């Protein structure tokens, strides 16, 4: 019966050895995969994540700086636009004042032209009156001469005839002097009035010319300011459109970056979960391996002819640490025999036994 038990134990031992070899091979593969995941993937993903995060922050900072610069330019353009509007209002007020002055000058010119026409009419009337008086004077002189000729009497040769011719000449000279004086006074008055009107017309014409020049200058300035205002309005609209486009693009890019960050975080979480799953599998395999090591050691003692019967209880394996890339597991099984207690402690790291100790205590009956 003991031989059958040993044979059965040998068969079980052989199957356990095959299973242990298979598990050791799987353990090595899992350890290599774990080292790869622990040493390379997390750092690479972390570096990629940090690099993308830094790039996104740089882009966000650049967009914020561009936005602030565009806002400053927009404020400056708004200030320039307000200044130009103020200047435009002032120029419009000056133009209105110039137009009012021009209308006043036009009224003065019209009044001066009307006065000139009236004076010319008076001069024509005076010249007509002078011509009429001259004709009347000549007619009166002719009638007087005819009367004097008709009233002449013949006297004797020794009697001297009255000096009528001299009197007529004196009268004619007096009338001619009066007519000449009146003509000269009229001509002088006409010349003075004409000169005054000419000076007034010249002054009004000069003022009108200056007013026209000022009006043209104001008109050119208004046109230039209007063109500048339209240009600034176009620039302001263009900058506002660019600002809206940049804000929309910034919002879209920010949303894309947030999606990318969320996706990377999800991938990192998935990798962490997968790593935890592999670590759990590795822990389970280590537990199985330790149990098999204990059972193999027990069978080895049986094969060496140990006479006592060993009952190995089910062990609990805890306190596995993977944070510092090291695994510290202590197993303290208790082997109950009839007369003694064997306690074996095995400590492993990365799948290799680094410390093993066995103690034996006598069991009191």
From Swiss-Prot:
Q: Is-annotated flag, keyword rRNA-binding? A: no
Question: InterPro entries, alphabetically?
Answer: IF_conserved (IPR018039), IF_rod_dom (IPR039008), Intermediate_filament (IPR050405), Keratin_I (IPR002957)
Q: Write the record's keywords in alphabetical order, separated by commas.
A: Coiled coil, Intermediate filament
A single GO CC term, please? cell projection
Q: Which GO terms describe its biological process?
A: intermediate filament organization; regulation of chaperone-mediated autophagy
Question: Which stretches of sequence are listed as region Tail?
Answer: 311-365
MF terms per GO, please?
A: structural constituent of cytoskeleton
In this chain, the stretch annotated as Coil 2B covers: 190-310
Where is the segment annotated Coil 1B? 49-147
SMART domains linked: Filament
Using the UniProt annotation, give all residue ranges assigned to the region (Linker 12). Answer: 148-163
Where's the IF rod domain? 2-310
Region feature (Linker 2):
186-189
Residues making up the signal peptide according to the UniProt record: none
The UniProt annotation puts the region (Coil 1A) at: 6-37
Q: Region (Coil 2A) spans which residues?
A: 164-185
Q: Where is this region: Linker 1?
A: 38-48
Q: Which Pfam families match?
A: Filament
Q: Which SUPFAM superfamilies match?
A: Intermediate filament protein, coiled coil region, Myosin rod fragments
Q: Where is this region: Head?
A: 1-5
Indicate the family of this protein: Belongs to the intermediate filament family.
Q: What is this protein called?
A: Glial fibrillary acidic protein
Q: What is the lineage of its organism?
A: Eukaryota, Metazoa, Chordata, Craniata, Vertebrata
């Amino acid at each position: 019966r003991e031989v059958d038990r040993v044979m059965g134990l040998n068969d079980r031992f052989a199957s356990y050895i095959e299973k242990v070899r298979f598990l050791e091979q799987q353990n090595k593969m899992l350890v290599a995969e774990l080292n790869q995941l622990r040493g390379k993937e997390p750092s690479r993903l972390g570096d990629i994540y940090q690099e993308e995060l830094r790039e996104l922050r740089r882009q966000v900072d650049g967009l914020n700086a561009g936005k602030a610069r565009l806002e400053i330019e927009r404020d400056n353009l708004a200030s320039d636009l307000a200044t130009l509007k103020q200047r435009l209002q002032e120029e419009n007020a000056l133009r209105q004042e110039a137009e009012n002055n021009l209308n006043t000058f036009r009224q003065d010119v019209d009044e001066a032209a009307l006065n000139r026409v009236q004076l010319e009419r008076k001069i024509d009337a005076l010249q007509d009156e002078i011509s009429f008086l001259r004709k009347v004077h000549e007619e009166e002189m002719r009638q007087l001469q005819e009367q004097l000729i008709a009233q002449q009497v013949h006297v004797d040769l020794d009697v001297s005839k009255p000096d009528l011719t001299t009197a007529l000449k004196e009268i004619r000279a007096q009338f001619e002097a009066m007519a000449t004086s009146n003509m000269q006074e009229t001509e002088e008055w006409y010349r003075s009035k004409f000169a005054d009107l000419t000076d007034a017309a010249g002054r009004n014409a000069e003022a009108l010319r200056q007013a026209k020049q000022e009006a043209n200058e104001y008109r050119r300035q208004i046109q230039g300011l209007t063109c500048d205002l339209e240009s600034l309005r176009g620039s302001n609209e263009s900058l506002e459109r660019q600002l809206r486009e940049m804000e929309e693009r910034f919002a879209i890019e920010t949303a894309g970056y947030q999606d990318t960050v969320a996706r990377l975080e999800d991938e990192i979480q998935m990798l962490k979960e997968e790593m935890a799953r592999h670590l759990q599998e590795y822990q389970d395999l280590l537990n199985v391996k330790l149990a098999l090591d204990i059972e193999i050691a027990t069978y080895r003692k049986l094969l060496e002819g140990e006479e006592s019967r060993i009952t190995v209880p089910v062990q609990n394996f805890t306190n596995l640490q993977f944070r510092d890339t090291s695994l510290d597991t202590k197993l303290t099984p208790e082997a109950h025999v009839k007369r003694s207690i064997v306690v074996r402690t095995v400590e492993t790291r990365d799948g290799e036994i680094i410390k093993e100790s066995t103690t034996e205590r006598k069991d009191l009956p």
